[in-house]
Swiss-Prot record:
Disruption phenotype: Both female and male vret mutants are sterile. SUPFAM superfamilies: Tudor/PWWP/MBT. The gene is vret. Gonad-specific. This is Protein vreteno. Keywords: Cytoplasm, Meiosis, Repeat.
Amino acid sequence: MESESSQDDWSAFDPMSREYYDQVGNRYTNESGQKLIMEAPLPPKDEKEQRATRQAKYPYLVVPKSSPYVTEKMLINFFGRALIKEMEFRRLSRVYFVYFENIASLETAQQRVQRYPNLIKCITGRPQKEREITSDPVTSTEPMPTPGPAISATERTPVNHNREVPISTGGQNHPEFFRPPLVTKDDYKRGSLLATNDPIQRYLNVKYEFALERHDIYKLKDETRIPQVVLHFRSGRTIPLSTVAVTEEDKTKSLLEDGVSKCVVCQNWTDTFCKLCKMPFCNASCFADVAEQHKQACGKGEILNLDEKVGRKYPKPGLPPSGSKVRITAFEQTNVVYVRSADIQIDIAYYTVLTEVMMLGKDASKLQSTPVCGQIVLYKFEGHMSRAMVLNVDNIKEIYVVFIDFGSVEVTQLERLYECSSYLAGLTCYPVAVKLRGVPRRFVGPNIREVMYELDQSLVFNIKYSSREYDTSKGMQVVVMTEIDINRSLNRLFKTILTPVEPSVSDLGYKEDCLPYIPLHCGKNINVVVMDNTFIQCGFIYCTSIDLAYEVTKMQRDIQEYGEKIAKCATYAPPINELCIAKYEGKWRRGLSVELVGDGYPSILFIDYGNIVPTHVTDIRPYPPQFIFPIMTTQLDLIGVPEKPTDEQIKWLDKNYPIGSVITCSEITFDEETNSYSTRIEKLQEFLSLD
């Protein structure tokens, strides 16, 4: 018996068992102390029942842990914390069960999975066994109620008029203003100066697209990085400073020292001479004009006595052949540009013309009478004289001229115009207007302006065209231009800048502060245009100047194109104080969300006009970042209007200040404390004093 008990005692003896079964010694860690073996928590007893309840109550996705990067935090960041109701990880099957609040959240999550299929893979569905839950049988014999139709985001429900922000009434159309054409066919009647100086009727379709610079909204000295472009003055013109600075005597001396003389025919500088008599000629064309006279005088030391009609003083103007190199002199529209040949002979002749106009124009006298359409005059710009052709003199205070040596259109007054001699008027004009193929005509906004200003005359472009693409209605050749240095297509660049891109709904919107603002001019006897009067009973209207009213209408063409053909978002409800593109009376306009009431009709303030209208979400689109157009409409308070006007007073105000009318303000003032504009109108004061 004793031997058996001793054997039992020894069998229980195991000195290593304590260390083997001790959990403290069985923790495996790496160098940084991180556990390599995770301890699985004990599952609760009712885990299966709870899981079945969750799967029956909430829609879910099954995400397998296909890689170590698929973690709980990664799924939260991927789907969004707002969509996820709960999350469960099964260690044995190594899958995540992601539960969502509702079906809409599930569909949103599925769309994200479909958009990025390489990140995660999901298994949708619900096992039949786990979905079955024991419940008491329904003992009621009454039929189940028929579910109502699902609410559609595109359904137009009744408008909730219980709003904090007042809305406009009346449903009047927004006013449209179109600038009268600068030149008409009547100006080209037989015998007129315009018909003589513009035989191809190029200026019949000329446009003035740079009106915003007159209101100091675009300042070249601040906008551009190229110092020389300051002399472009809103359209690409360049005055060669080196040509102006160097005097004729110093330039002649330096050229003679380099073995350069003036051509006996065209009087341009050249280093080409006859080998026998050392007579200078520019090229074979100049030599051919005086070949007979040179043959008789060559080697005899005689000087050629040439008539003024002999030879061409300047190379022949016109559009160079396809494949030639050109330089840009000015931009008229987004798709119309003035170019000249970059040939060295044209360069010399072009700057010679500019220099001659500057030098001889110093002694010109001012115009004493109103010029006529088509007359060549001199215009003083930045202290230098330039040749210009008068296009429109309907308003003596706003005379439209085109700089024939550049191509740009300018508005000036009689005091800045000078008489042009017949000699200067007869000098050759080299810039030619061409139309960029595939580039639409759009509003000249900040983005395209900055590019225009930076395209200096130092840049050389390769021009290509086909004579079959000549636009006879506009009098221009359709061309493709490519910058030689970096092989960049000017047509493609302009088209990319001018085409707006619809932002994603998930992107942050744009505030009203992102847009520049052009305020009203303060002073006396100022004419303004009424853009909206729906809040006239509150004592204010929305106005702008006549010039800016043209720009507002011109801007709508781009916005309409975006709303009809580019924006594809079916529904959009912009947050409060964010910009959007909204439809009003069938036309797309710029808007600002001012109130959301949950009925599908956000209150939209149309910032270019001033009315506030509940607009359905199907008629709203996200605001594209390319539309950095300035706000040109201002709220104008009417001094003297009572806080609660009578019906008779409201009727009188609506009649005398209708939408689209031009009114004369006796005085416009600005209050810095309230940041508001107000006006005093004598006619209004007289009416209110009678009451």
